[in-house]
From Swiss-Prot:
Chain segments annotated as coiled-coil in the UniProt record: none
HAMAP family, A to Z: NusB (MF_00073)
Gene coding for it: nusB
Gene Ontology MF annotations: RNA binding
Keywords: RNA-binding, Transcription, Transcription antitermination, Transcription regulation
Family that this chain belongs to: Belongs to the NusB family.
Function: Involved in transcription antitermination. Required for transcription of ribosomal RNA (rRNA) genes. Binds specifically to the boxA antiterminator sequence of the ribosomal RNA (rrn) operons.
Pfam family, one: NusB
Protein name as it appears in the record: Transcription antitermination protein NusB
GO cellular component, as recorded: cytosol
InterPro entries: NusB-like_sf, NusB_fam, NusB_RsmB_TIM44
GO biological process, one term: transcription antitermination
């Protein structure tokens, strides 16, 4: 598994746990990093950056996702999908070195592995529309 995909998976683990426990993502991240064996994985820095950035911009990310998820509220989305969308939208808006197509395809691939059968298509649609918005 490529390093950035591993980082996204780790970020997803932290965000998912924070979501389920209703805790701040950065607080869950601190416990997660503390539990990791040493030496720390090389991709950990990118995962930490994702979680910290998402925590800072969470309200804006959720607002965008909710506005483009036609017929769905954030609370109604599966937690995995909601958090994959947060990761991808953060990358679309704030991580210049990641191409939009890569951010979207990585989220879709993780959804294919970890969520419902409908999730990849659902995320691809939302993220594609948000990517169009982000490039205007």
């Amino acid at each position: 598994m490529p390093a950035r995909r591993k980082a996204r998976k780790r970020a997803l683990d932290v965000l998912f746990e924070a979501d389920l426990r209703d805790r701040p993502p950065v607080e869950v991240l601190a416990g997660y990093v503390e539990r990791l064996e040493k030496p720390r994985p090389e991709h950990l820095g990118y995962a930490v950056g994702l979680v910290e950035g998402i925590a800072v911009h969470l309200d804006r990310l959720d607002e965008l996702i909710a506005s483009y998820a036609e017929g769905w509220t954030l609370d109604r989305m599966p937690a995995v999908d909601r958090n994959l969308a947060r990761i991808a939208v953060y990358e679309l808006l704030y991580v210049d070195e990641i191409d939009d197509a890569v951010a979207i395809s990585e989220a879709v691939e993780l959804a294919r592995q970890m969520s419902t059968d409908d999730s990849p298509r659902f995320l691809n649609g939302i993220l594609g529309r948000i990517a169009e918005y982000a490039t205007r």
